[in-house]
Amino acid sequence: MSSIYKALAGKSKDNKSEKKQGNVKQFMNKQRTLLISSRGVNYRHRHLIQDLSGLLPHSRKEPKLDTKKDLQQLNEIAELYNCNNVLFFEARKHQDLYLWLSKPPNGPTIKFYIQNLHTMDELNFTGNCLKGSRPVLSFDQRFESSPHYQLIKELLVHNFGVPPNARKSKPFIDHVMSFSIVDDKIWVRTYEISHSTKNKEEYEDGEEDISLVEIGPRFVMTVILILEGSFGGPKIYENKQYVSPNVVRAQIKQQAAEEAKSRAEAAVERKIKRRENVLAADPLSNDALFK
């Protein structure tokens, strides 16, 4: 009996050791993104945030932030909801949209200016993807050309890359998010991975034609600056070629004012020229002789 007991006890110890070895914690990519906007967003900005919320199942959408000055509150909100990424959309003058990409609590933070914005409702593309599916992130080769682009790529991966087994995500990969650099601007596009076959035999043999069909939304981001901390800290990069939309609008208004001024001056010159070119009265004309 003692030998049987020892054999069974040895087996139980072996099973416990195997369970302990099997219960070793594996690395899990726990990324959660906070989607939040400021006051003053218009309907197009709101539709863009809604589209991104549908494409990012690991995100949490929150109501608008009341302040635009004290952005440090976003770190507390992210900590409250266990989010380690923040996408903050800041609206100015009901027409300009800025995107703050941050990694709380230690940073860094990247500020973008968004232009050429088109939502899914505007585009009406034929592409579609499963809600909650994970994307394939495609980056341009120029993201490896400079250190600040490498940092931007890393933050884009953390914010737009849906980790496996994420909240509300489905185990499918059926769309691609493309980030390309053209004219020092980041162009964002979303495509569906479409599979098509001519007949059942090709489908069974795995001979499928794979193509990309655009879904939307599409927009262009211009880098403004990069901060070392999360919504604060020293400035580690600044885009010297960035021109504020306020400056652009002021230049357009100034050009229109100069054109209006030149038109008014030309009209005055025409009136003066007409007065100067009036013919003098002929003393031998019928009007002068037969009054």
From Swiss-Prot:
UniProt GO BP: endonucleolytic cleavage in ITS1 upstream of 5.8S rRNA from tricistronic rRNA transcript (SSU-rRNA, 5.8S rRNA, LSU-rRNA); exonucleolytic trimming to generate mature 5'-end of 5.8S rRNA from tricistronic rRNA transcript (SSU-rRNA, 5.8S rRNA, LSU-rRNA); ribosomal large subunit assembly
Alphabetized UniProt keyword annotations: Nucleus, Phosphoprotein, Ribosome biogenesis
GO cellular component assignments: nucleolus; preribosome, large subunit precursor
Subcellular location per the Swiss-Prot or TrEMBL entry: Nucleus, Nucleolus
Transmembrane keyword on record: no
One term of GO molecular function: rRNA primary transcript binding
A Pfam family reported for this protein in Swiss-Prot or TrEMBL: Brix
Domain of life: Eukaryota
Residues bearing the modification Phosphoserine: 285
InterPro entries cross-referenced by the UniProt entry: Brix, BRX1
Keyword Transmembrane helix: no
Domain Brix: 31-232
Main localization category: nucleus
UniProt record similarity statement: Belongs to the BRX1 family.
Xref: PANTHER family: RIBOSOME BIOGENESIS PROTEIN BRIX, RIBOSOME BIOGENESIS PROTEIN BRX1 HOMOLOG
Function: Required for biogenesis of the 60S ribosomal subunit.
Other remarks in the entry: Present with 13200 molecules/cell in log phase SD medium.
Complex and partners: Part of a complex that includes BRX1, RPF1, RPF2 and SSF1 or SSF2.
Protein name, entry field: Ribosome biogenesis protein BRX1
